[in-house]
Amino acid sequence: MADVLSQNEIDALLKQLSTGELDADDFTETKSVKVKEYDFSRPAKFSKEHLRTLEIIFEHYGRLLSSNLPAYLRKNVQVEVMNSEAVTYSEFSNALSNPVLLGVVNMAPLSGNIIIEIATNLGYAIIDRLLGGVGEPLEKKREFSEIELSILEKIFTILIDLLREPWTNVVEIHPYLERIETNPQFAQIISPTEMIAIVTVNINIGGVEGLMNICLPYLTLEDVMDKLNTKYWFSTMQDRDETSYADVIETAILSLIHISEPTRH
């Protein structure tokens, strides 16, 4: 505890100030300690490094979409990762329109689900294209029919299968579609206050543009959060590349040995 001045000491200081022996400017304030506010409703569970690694994963995913989807849609597909951010699940769900197009994805062996949201205009364009049309979106929003959802389920299955490869450097996943929801109220996969990471991807299908949002709850990724850093991601990628290269060399050597062996009659 700081020392407390006696009355005599206070009187002496006042006298020195009044006579000019002391200058008030000589007394400087102690620098205030900077305090960083912490919002308990938005705990910082995703660092910038986590978000950057997720962007790298989905940049890889975007390249797979660009090269695989044209085979089904017979249209040029361009995919670009726009950004990533950490928000609460309620912020994500409250921003959803109705109807919406949500794929609830099981990320086995990780516990919990993720959500893939596809812009409805892209959904309508995909349906039109798969039914023989030119791939134009509807001018006015409406509910998806059961037949249309059945068609979109096949596309979601393709999208989800393509998730496997980009995640290999972090964890080997076996994702599958649990269900499609068109009402955001029925897609409450976690508590509204839980933190999630959202990766936003822009998709252009033959001139029709829309966003795809991937909602990744912290609770789903919790077991692999320590692996969501660029250093780990690139090191495992290099290890896998070296292993693949070694496998190719081994196969080539075995083939040469087999060829060089004399044929026995």
Predicted regions located by residue number:
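N-terminal auxiliary interaction/assembly segments of multi-subunit proteins
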Residues: 1-260, 264
